[in-house]
C-alpha cells in the first residue's frame, strides 16, 4: 500500500518498512535460543512460499521475533550515540499522545506506518483502508483501557489479511502497533493477535530508547497465558511471569510491577505513558436520523452517534457561556439562515429537543435541518467540549492537565459541503493547537483542506 504525507503544502513519501540490507535480527539478553524446543512458531499467516504470499510480515516469525518491526529503528537495538537524552525522555515534555500508528499486517494494510499530528486526516479512494486504520486505533485504545481482546476486536476475521493462509496449527492473525510520545520520550508498542482458531494475544513488545521494557510470547498454546518478561535492572535483569492472553500486558504492568528499582520505575513510567495516550479516545460518527427526534433527559454525556445531542445542548449551554458562544458561531457558519442561539427545549412529556433560535422569534427544530447541518453541529460540539461531556473513559487517576482526548471520526466529510468541511477543519485546527484534544479523521477528498494550517493529510492508495 502506498502512503504519502502532507502537512500544509509540503509532501513527502513514506518508504515501506524493511530491515536494512544485510542487517541480522537483534536479540536481547535473556531471550531463549533461536531453536529452543517447545517454542510455537508464530507463523499466523501460513507458508511464505505459498503463491501470492511472499514477503508477508507474519510469515516465519518465532515467538521472540514476531513483533520485530522491519524497517524503522529496531526496538531491540542498543541506544545509539547521542540518543541517551531522548531515551531518558529529557527532551519530551508534554501530554502523552500517539505520534504513529503501525499496521504491519491488518486487513488491507501491510507494513504501513501513519504519522499522527494534532490534526490528521486520512484520505484515499474507497478500499484504501481508511476505516480499518481507525478501527485499529480504536482497538488499541480499548486494549489500553483494560478491555479484553474479544471486546477490542469484535469482528476478528475481517482484520486478518485476506491472503493469509493458516499454518500447520491452523492459526491466522494480525499485527498492529503504535508509538506514544511524552515525558518518557517515544515509547513503542507492538501487538500480535491470533484470530483463528481462537482469539488471543500471542505476542507483545513495549520498548523505549532502544531497550525492550516488556516482551510476551505464547509458549504453550494449551494454556490461556503468555510468558512475560519485563525489565528490572536489579539483581536480575528481567522478571518473568505469566500474563493472561486476553489482555494487553502493558495495561496490566502497574498491577504487577512493584517499582522498587530504577528499571522497574522506567517500565512503569513507559507503560503509564502508553496507557494514558491510548485511553482517552472518542469514536464519533454523528447519525442525523437519530438526532432529529426529542430524547429523554439523561446524563448529558454525548454518545458516539450523537443521538442525545439535544440533552447535551441542555447541559452545555448552562455550564460554559464562552464555549456555548463558540458553538453558536460554528452553527452560524455551518447552517443555512441566521442563527442567534443553539438551545434545547423541555417538552410536556419530559423529553428534550434541540432548536436553532433564528433571532426573529422563530425557532427551528433540529429535525428540520439537513444531514450536513446536523453533522457539522454535532462535530463542532465534540471539538469544543472535553471528556466530561463525552461518553469516554478517561484515566481518572491522571490529572486532566496531563491527558489528551483523541477524537476518531470516520467519514468526517460525509454529508458536508466544501464550505462546511473547511469551517469544521478550521475549528478543529484551532482546538487541536491547544493540546488538550487531537483529531484523526477519514475523508474521501482532502483537496479543499490540505493547505490549511495545522492540518496533516495522509494519502492512502489501495
Per-region residue spans from a language model:
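Phosphate-binding glycine-rich loops of NTP-binding sites
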Residues: 118-156, 371-386, 427
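Conserved P-loop NTP-binding catalytic core
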Residues: 135-196
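Electropositive, glycine-dotted interaction segments
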Residues: 194-325
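Asp/Glu-rich intrinsically disordered low-complexity tracts
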Residues: 22-47, 51, 55-56, 60, ...
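Pre-Walker A-like glycine/lysine-rich segment at the N-terminus of P-loop NTPase domains
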Residues: 2, 12-15, 20, 71, ...
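Conserved ABC ATPase signature
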Residues: 325, 332-336, 340-404, 411-421
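C-terminal lobe/lid and adjacent interdomain/linker elements of RecA-like ASCE P-loop ATPase modules
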Residues: 2-4, 9, 15, 422-462
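Hydrophobic positions in the central parallel beta-sheet of the AAA+
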Residues: 101, 405-408
